[in-house]
Amino acid sequence: MASFITRAERSGNIFSRVTGLIRAGQLNWADRPLWYDVYVSSPPLTPPDWNVKLAKYDEPIRSIFYEEDVLRAKFYKTYRSTAGIQVDSSRTSVSQQFINEYKLVKSENAEATDDQLFEMTQKRLNENGIVLK
């Protein structure tokens, strides 16, 4: 079975192989590559590793959902936003205000379910003058 890493790559990284050639006299110091001096002056923080574990092609990709993502999706499912979001605006969007208020309500009512927290947040935002459509 063929491997994607050649035997030369397993014997060491390119820096160690060039260093070996210079020490053995097979490569003159004046003929060293341009990147060699840069590598010597500032080596990488973690050494290169040829034995990297790559994901297999048949492994499923894990779904990563944060609580805020699920809440934002539920918000937009309930209240369709017709307004555009301005990236350079200093104002927070209605959905972000909803999420911030939801976190406050959740910290005050830890025993409430998600649906109850959602309704409490709706009521609190309506009381504060933010109209949800």
UniProtKB/Swiss-Prot annotation:
It comes from the Eukaryota. The keyword Transmembrane helix does not apply. GO terms for cellular component: mitochondrial small ribosomal subunit; mitochondrion. Keywords: Mitochondrion, Ribonucleoprotein, Ribosomal protein. It is found in: Mitochondrion. GO terms for molecular function: structural constituent of ribosome. GO terms for biological process: translation. Component of the mitochondrial ribosome small subunit (28S) which comprises a 12S rRNA and about 30 distinct proteins. PANTHER family: MITOCHONDRIAL RIBOSOMAL PROTEIN S23 (PTHR15925), SMALL RIBOSOMAL SUBUNIT PROTEIN MS23 (PTHR15925:SF2). Belongs to the mitochondrion-specific ribosomal protein mS23 family. This is Small ribosomal subunit protein mS23. It comes from Caenorhabditis elegans. The lineage of its organism: Eukaryota, Metazoa, Ecdysozoa, Nematoda, Chromadorea.
